[in-house]
Curated annotation (Swiss-Prot):
Quaternary structure and interacting proteins, as annotated: Heterooligomer composed of large and small subunits.
Role, per record: Bidirectionally degrades single-stranded DNA into large acid-insoluble oligonucleotides, which are then degraded further into small acid-soluble oligonucleotides.
Cell location: Cytoplasm
GO MF, one example: exodeoxyribonuclease VII activity
Primary location recorded for the protein, binned into one broad class: cytoplasm
Native source species: Escherichia coli (strain SMS-3-5 / SECEC)
InterPro entries: Exonuc_VII_L, Exonuc_VII_lsu_C, OB-fold_nuc-bd_dom
Name of this chain's protein: Exodeoxyribonuclease 7 large subunit
Gene coding for it: xseA
Keyword field: Cytoplasm, Exonuclease, Hydrolase, Nuclease
Length: 455
């Protein structure tokens, strides 16, 4: 028999659609943490990746209009926290989530905040060397801002006691971990500056995770360190731990113990300095006593030497010594004067103008001879060129032509006659012959006929 009520029968499409609606309406938005794998970004700009943990995984999509708000580039293996909607891709029946927002999870988020704050403060110049204060040398009082129960305080006090037991230490106890720690650290720094009891501050704590050290990555703490008039030595964690406070502080020490080393003087060094000072004092006293003794001996000797006879003998001896010195000085002076005179005579002989005059005269004679020879040569050449020119002129001169029997006739205006048409009857002409001039009057003009050319 058939049951009284038939069960609902779904098609595959309807089943997938029903499941999708149930997921979207019943689950809504959820927060999911996991590790990114298989991250891809096609040309569309959408992100496709898988979120997984130790035992499961889920496919994810983050569309371009959502991923453009993400402030970091997701990497394979990165732990993230996403806000997403659960859905189902109906054509394939694939269950997936649509990511709306993404941020690093755990230390990843803290590291991102660390880098952002570091870049911000660096851009403002809080890390610049020009703002760093010099540490006092030596320090007369050290202030320590840390937990009163932490190992860092114990290490600092132990080092200071070993190196410089007489150095005063003022402790400003504060929390170094937790939500209240940044505010307490800031107040401790401000209090130390207000009381102005110490000339250097150590701000720090022992090692720990990034979350444990996060108070020293707080912007308020960084700005308080930067504003401190008292030089600040940061001593946070171990040598590999670097916080924002390290960048802002006037000096970064890798550990609290190292910070104590930096601000204190070595006791052994102090003892050596004291011993050196005592030795210098003893030497000064010995020198002073020896000097006084020598002075006393001199005075005593002078008193013994004050007898008149001794004084007279000393003066006689002094007079003889002075006479010898005077004679010796006069001889030396005369000798030096003679030598000086000889040098002057030699210099004068060297400066005698007679040899120079003789050389100059010889040079002038040579130049005169060369000039006369040059002029004679140039005159001979000029004469030869002139003779050649005269011969050439005579060869081409009209006078030579006239001497051979030719004549030149010119009109009254001086124009040379070349044709009979230039002459009129009754005109006066001038004819130049080889030995004179003939003036004549034209009585008739006859033009020669040109000979006919043979046919």
């Amino acid at each position: 028999m058939l049951p009284s009520q038939s069960p609902a029968i779904f098609t595959v499409s309807r089943l997938n659609q029903t499941v999708r609606l149930l997921l979207e309406h019943e689950m809504g938005q959820v927060w999911i943490s996991g590790e990114i794998s298989n991250f891809t970004q096609p040309a569309s700009g959408h992100w496709y990746f898988t979120l997984k943990d130790d035992t499961a995984q889920v496919r994810c999509a983050m569309f371009r209009n959502s991923n453009r708000r993400v402030t970091f580039r997701p990497q394979h293996g990165q732990q993230v926290l996403v806000r997403a909607n659960i859905t189902l891709y109906e054509p394939r029946g694939d269950y997936q989530i649509i990511v709306e927002s993404m941020q690093p999870a755990g230390e990843g988020l803290l590291q991102q905040k660390y880098e952002q704050l570091k870049a911000k403060l660096q851009a403002e110049g809080l890390f610049d060397l020009q703002y760093k204060n010099s540490l006092p040398s030596p320090a007369h009082c050290v202030g320590v801002i840390t937990s009163k129960t932490g190992a860092a305080l114990h290490d600092i006090l132990h080092v200071l006691k070993r190196r410089d037991p007489s150095l005063p230490v003022i402790i400003y106890p504060t929390a170094v971990q937790g939500d209240d720690a940044p505010g307490q650290i800031v107040r401790a720094i401000e209090l130390a500056n207000q009381r102005n009891e110490c000339d250097v501050l150590i701000v720090g704590r022992g090692g720990g995770s990034l979350e444990d050290l996060w108070s020293f990555n707080d912007e308020r703490v960084a700005r308080a360190i930067f504003a401190s008039r008292i030089p600040v030595v940061s001593a946070v964690g171990h040598e590999t731990d670097v916080t924002i406070a390290d960048f802002v502080a006037d000096l970064r020490a890798p550990t609290p113990s190292a910070a104590a080393e930096v601000v204190s003087r070595n006791q052994q060094e102090l003892l050596r300095q004291v011993q050196s000072a005592r030795q210098r004092l003893e030497m000064a006293m010995d020198y002073y006593l020896a000097n006084r003794t020598r002075r006393f001996t001199q005075i005593h000797h002078r008193l013994q030497q004050q007898h008149p006879q001794l004084r007279l003998a000393r003066q006689q001896t002094m007079l003889e010594r002075l006479q010898k010195r005077m004679s010796f000085a006069l001889e030396n002076q005369l000798k030096r004067a003679g030598q000086h005179q000889q040098r002057l005579t030699q210099r004068l002989n060297q400066q005698n103008p007679q040899p120079k005059i003789h050389r100059a005269q010889t040079r002038i004679q040579q130049l005169e001879y060369r000039l006369a020879e040059t002029l004679r040569a140039q005159l001979s050449a000029t004469r030869e060129r002139f003779g050649n020119a005269v011969t050439h002129l005579e060869a081409v001169s009209p006078l030579s032509t006239l001497a051979r029997g030719y004549s030149v006739t010119s009109a009254a205006d001086g124009a040379v006659l070349k044709q009979v048409k230039q002459v009129k009857v009754g005109e006066t002409l001038t004819t130049r012959l080889g030995d004179g001039v003939v003036i004549s009057e034209v009585s008739a003009v006859t033009k020669s006929r040109k000979p006919r050319k043979k046919a």
